[in-house]
């Protein structure tokens, strides 16, 4: 669930001389993005947001069953439609490596259910992507 702090965190982007961009938050987070090799595109960041949200949402369920420090490997891809210049769907594969735990089939199924439940309940990004989300934009030109 989104907390109040997430709603008031200030985020902004700035262009670099080399053409890449940097994203910042007022609490010190930073990521480079743009077009080209070695940087994430905005579309990549959408997919990373979805995977990251699933990772954080499922972390407790996985650590509770396996041990601290364990987590899922989450791969997200999407179908891009050039006509609408939009992603029309995302596919998320959540893989939990529990080979060291030697879980029974029943315990593995319980973990799968818990991970699914935690992501379904707690992933704000997924909740946002599933619904149609209005975006308001205001353009200001300073002179």
Protein language model regions, located:
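Extended beta-strand/beta-hairpin segments
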Residues: 5-48, 59-143
């Amino acid at each position: 669930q989104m907390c109040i702090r997430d709603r008031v965190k200030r985020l902004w982007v700035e262009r670099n001389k080399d053409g890449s961009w940097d994203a910042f938050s007022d609490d010190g987070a930073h990521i480079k993005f743009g077009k080209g090799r070695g940087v994430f595109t905005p579309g990549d960041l959408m997919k990373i947001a979805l995977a990251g949200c699933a990772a954080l949402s499922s972390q407790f369920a996985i650590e509770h069953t396996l041990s601290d420090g364990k987590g899922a490997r989450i791969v997200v891809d999407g179908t891009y439609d050039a006509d609408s210049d939009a992603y029309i769907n995302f596919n998320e594969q959540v893989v939990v490596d529990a080979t060291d735990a030697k879980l029974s089939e029943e315990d593995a199924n319980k973990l799968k259910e818990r991970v699914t439940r935690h992501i379904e309940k707690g992933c704000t990004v997924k909740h946002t992507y599933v619904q149609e989300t209005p975006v308001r934009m205001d353009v200001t030109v300073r002179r």
